[in-house]
């Protein structure tokens, strides 16, 4: 038998390697989610190729679905700090708090990389858009180009950037909208990953329904806040915009309200999960759909069950 210190070293390596792989998957998955999403926003804002909120929302939804299918079997496909926090609170045996920081870092990394990619690909189109519309990057009004990366309230593409528009919704109001949308999203996710829910569709369809839910939420609330529901999705590309010349228009934003896209989802996610855990799940009893795994395995799923 190897010495104790060698056994401990082997144990550390055996537990560290799966975490490294999970974090790598979170980087890839978040990158895919954000590149699809802000790519659609860039296409709509800069070229008019996507006409209407629903078209952009559908691309976001499919981006989420694809990212989940790609990464769920490795990392659980959180792809969102609000999702990770919520699972750490309510499924801590499967997703302990010690994983939060590595997951959050990975998600932010993927989002930053996606933002850099869009800046690289669409850079000339952004410059042309600003010139055609008389926008000075980093000055008041340049939210109309910065919205490709971060999010603003109300939606600059619909309401403009003047004082009248800014008076429609406050930073606190934006945080409430973000919390509300994220709560609904997590409520749906918790219902879809709970195989004691006899009304579940085939487990392999769960990513599709999650993506569809997000698409619907975006179509409903994007006029208000651009519908983030994901701190990494907003803050990662927003950092890119900050260093690419938008400065204070990106952070802290024209109303100083960039925090709404971080605090809102982190508060709303656990609220949505709590609604499911304490109001819906107790009514399920011990009913387990035919074809599911055992109750012991399903009591605390880490997230999207695809394997």
Language-model segments: residues:
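Membrane-interface helix-loop junctions and terminal tails of multi-pass membrane proteins
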Residues: 1-307
